[in-house]
Amino acid sequence: MEIKKNTMIIGLGNCGCKITKLFADMGYSTMFANGSEQDLKVLGNMKGIYKLDGYDGFGGHRERAMECLCDNVEFTEALEKIEQKIIILIYAVGGSTGSGLSAVVAQYIKDVYGENKIIVTVPVLPKENEAINRHKNSYQAVQELMSLDGIRATFFLDNKNCEVT
């Protein structure tokens, strides 16, 4: 199996989209989902950009993720058309869009494809000096991630040692 050809990388939220752009530049199949039009501008004319209408960040309210997914049918339809065998979700757990959407999107993919896809998550941890609410979001997001069945692998990135400009 050729890894690049059989992998779809999905960036959720600003951090996830920035990292996913690096993979797009290397020729991987990618999708980007964020509610902030300003954040999406840094992606330029990449293919697979999904503006989550009505959700310019979740303002720390991660529970809005399911509502967001239901309100953005274009994104869910794109998730239902993924041909690649491996799906990698990249997102920051300290924010709200990526951390809120991560478990919901992973579960949605699992519900659509069952065991036919390999789901891998790549959560980016906040820096030590970030606000306490970012660490609270991280804890909640990781708890949700741990409760999901069907995630084949998780690779944590330390934001302290991984700067993406």
Give the location of each predicted region.
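Tubulin/FtsZ superfamily GTPase core signature
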Residues: 1-165
